[in-house]
Amino acid sequence: MGETAWTGTPVIPHPDARDNDAEKLPWGGRREKLPMRWPFADAVEGFRSKALANKQYDPASTFVWGQMMAVGLIEMLKAIEAAFGADGHDVARAALRKVGDRIATEMIDGVEKPGDLSPAELSSLFASWINEVAYASIENPKVEGDGASFDIHYCPHEDVYGAFDCRVQRYLVEGMIEAARRHWGDGMIDVAFATTIPSGSRTCHFDMFPKGEGSDKWFEYSDRLRDRALKIVDVK
């Protein structure tokens, strides 16, 4: 990737992002501690039994299809913001949040929290399900005391998106967070990002920490991105 993403958004390539050992990290095993479900379960089974069972089918074509849908959503959001300003942005963000909520609800509905999990452990395992299943990523998670963190070593969008484009994924996560808190209570801890691959880092790093009284870091940063987006399209 050069200094401009496929979407036209600026990026800062990191020389080691392509060689950050993603291929050596474990995937999937820790999720067994929290027995959530795959969303789109019937469709997933159809994909496995029809497409993946076909030895001539290249799963990379599914990747290309997914990127096409993703960049189409970026362009749609930018066009809505340019044409309808704050109202357009808010409607689009709410729609993405609704989708994220529904996906997470399918994953956790009827799932009981193991009694021996701390809020940090529960939040970390929930994040692993979101990272690996919903976002098809490869992560390196840690739980330390009452907090947790994870590094994303591979994200399907890392060579297509610019850093500002990642806000679309953020809005989906808003709904996922709301679903988790509704299901397991407000004890689910807050989350904030520190670095991203498109903004010049080797990995995307996220920190998870106890939610402060009257504070919600994930949603607060989303609001700041809203203001930035509307300035870009010069909304008066």
Where are these regions (language model features)?
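Phosphate-moiety recognition in structured ligand-binding domains
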Residues: F150
